[in-house]
């Protein structure tokens, strides 16, 4: 059994959607707790997501209280799916399975309090959450991650601070410095 978790309730069929992979996929996952992390909208500027040696999801907050701000007050639906037609290793994330075809939902479970459910999973050692730390090593890791994603995703640095409050609140200095070092003045 695979899982697809969404903030949208009541789906009977999942349709392929084009995302960052630029191909229409239905996304699924084997680990329910990892799936629950996708029950609210977030991206690489909120968390770094990985897995530990036991396959448990590990998230690192990219700014203070990211976990709480993303998940508190959210509900989601867990869709149970048969694994037929799903493929592994079609994306860069090994935990992710995809299907290029529409997929019938076998069952739906509604999670009415996603934040508290994830806190329970953390208490049960099924989820590791690294809250934002004000130490140099942690901040260096987050800074490197943010810079990598800004460049990799070809984000328009000139407008991002106005269009996304995370950048004006938490990442303004990184964006300002990147604009300065990428404007060409450092080259002969």
Task: For the regions a language model picked out, list residue spans one by one.
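Short, flexible beta-strand-to-coil junctions
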Residues: 4-10, 30, 81-86
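Extended catalytic/binding region for NAD+/ADP-ribose chemistry, centered on the ART fold
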Residues: 20-44
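A broad, low-specificity signal marking well-ordered, structured residues that form hydrophobic/aromatic
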Residues: 1, 26-27, 76-79
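Short catalytic/ligand-binding loop motif for oxyanion handling, primarily in non-cytosolic enzymes
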Residues: 12, 36-37, 87-89
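Conserved NAD+-utilizing ADP-ribose enzyme module
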Residues: 22, 41-188
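ADP-ribose/NAD+-binding catalytic cleft of ART/PARP-like enzymes
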Residues: 1-23, 40
